[in-house]
């Protein structure tokens, strides 16, 4: 296949494969979270050392989004996706072979950068979507991506406990290598929307950031939600082991509860069309805030009640976060369609800076204040995101009243 014009039947299959590719690639940056106790035992890491693995992976993802994702507006997306796939497969294999902390941290950073192929896939799906179905198509691919984020913990937790953390990374490397071949075979070549040199392309990213206040607020709000999300998932496995003597497979099992939220991605897109993207971001941020705040009730419950409450909260905050993310994407993509790659880069730079901060702050607060400290961080940052969206709504309403 070498054209960018697809029949509807073929397009559906290609979009399905893209959803799988997005899920598997983004999963690469989350496999470590339920495996941290196993890695720590194997490599003799402190809690702070374990926390640096997801922190650097998320930081690498943020760097890759900011500095590599804009290339999608300059070069053929198929080539970018395949090259990143090959690099990611090699890095995952290298991670499985590492024997000391410094090489593990370096490879974790590079895995994050290569895994940004997931964010090349999302705009590619929008381009390949049939006329009038871009929202639904992006929602489908985002469902794959979000399921990859959440189910990655379940898979890695089970595989890690049964076979060891190194085997999990070897299986991940094999799956990405297969995807690289499939993507090369099925994807068309994509039109290039810019002939800017790389330095000019990056300057245009700065221009877009300055030009659109709505973009800045979207990145900031989603970034604060991401701090909450990452702080929870980065410390959950350690907390379950220390307080309940539960292994990594149980920590991964909570990903199944969170996966229910990922299924809301297409629904959130439709809701944004009816209520407006801004309204959906408010509802999503409110749900995240309430879901984390509920976990302050844990001391009043027995052990089983506490574990159930964690699962219920995970469903709630994942549902809210993913709904807010899809609505923010709809909002940002509409600002300047010819610059989707760069706009996506800016939005997700905010997201994954938040993820990296959440991992780092979560680990530090868990060491200093335990699980209540992590929940306090998550609740406060989610509330800040809600305040940003409510302030945006108030600003818009005031502007409408002045103009009427």
PLM segments and residue spans:
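Intracellular juxtamembrane helix-capping segments at the cytosolic ends
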Residues: 117-129, 321-336
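Conserved MFS/SLC helix-loop-helix module at the cytosolic interface between two early adjacent transmembrane helices
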Residues: 63-101
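Juxtamembrane intracellular "pre-TM" segments in multi-pass secondary transporters
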Residues: 2-8, 187-220
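Cytoplasmic helix-loop-helix junction between adjacent transmembrane helices
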Residues: 107-145
């Amino acid at each position: 296949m070498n054209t960018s014009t697809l029949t509807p039947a073929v397009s559906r299959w290609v979009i399905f494969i893209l959803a799988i590719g997005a899920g598997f690639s983004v999963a690469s940056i989350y496999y470590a979270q339920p495996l941290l106790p196993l890695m720590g035992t194997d490599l003799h890491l402190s809690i702070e050392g374990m926390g640096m693995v997801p922190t650097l992976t998320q930081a690498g993802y943020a760097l890759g989004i900011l500095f590599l994702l804009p290339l999608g507006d300059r070069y053929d997306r198929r080539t970018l996706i395949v090259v990143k796939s090959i690099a990611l497969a090699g890095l995952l294999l290298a991670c499985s072979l590492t024997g000391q902390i410094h090489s593990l941290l370096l490879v974790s950073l590079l895995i994050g950068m290569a895994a940004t192929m997931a964010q090349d896939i999302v705009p590619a799906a929008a381009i390949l979507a049939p006329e009038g179905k871009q929202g639904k198509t992006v929602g489908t691919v985002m469902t794959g991506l979000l399921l990859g984020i959440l189910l990655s913990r379940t898979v890695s937790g089970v595989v890690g406990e049964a076979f060891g953390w190194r085997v999990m990374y070897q299986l991940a490397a094999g799956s990405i290598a297969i995807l690289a071949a499939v993507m090369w075979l099925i994807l068309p070549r994509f039109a290039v929307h810019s002939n800017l040199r790389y330095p000019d392309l990056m300057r245009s990213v700065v221009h877009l950031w300055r030009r659109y206040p709505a973009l800045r607020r979207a990145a900031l709000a989603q970034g604060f939600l991401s701090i909450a999300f990452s702080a929870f998932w980065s410390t959950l496995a350690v907390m379950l082991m220390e307080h309940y003597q539960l292994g990594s497979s149980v920590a991964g099992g909570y990903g199944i509860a969170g996966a229910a939220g990922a299924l809301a991605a297409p629904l959130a897109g439709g809701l944004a069309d009816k209520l407006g993207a801004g309204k959906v971001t408010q509802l999503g941020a409110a749900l995240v805030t309430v879901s984390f705040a509920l976990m302050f009730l844990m001391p009043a419950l027995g052990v089983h009640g506490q574990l159930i409450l964690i699962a219920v909260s995970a469903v709630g905050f994942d549902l809210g976060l993913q709904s807010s993310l899809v609505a923010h994407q709809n909002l940002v993509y509409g600002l300047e369609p010819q610059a989707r790659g760069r706009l996506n880069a800016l939005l997700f730079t905010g997201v994954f800076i938040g993820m990296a901060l959440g991992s780092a702050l979560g680990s530090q607060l868990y060491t200093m204040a335990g699980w209540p400290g992590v929940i306090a961080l998550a609740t406060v940052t989610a509330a800040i995101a809600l305040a940003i969206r409510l302030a945006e709504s108030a600003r818009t309403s005031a502007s409408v009243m002045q103009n009427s």
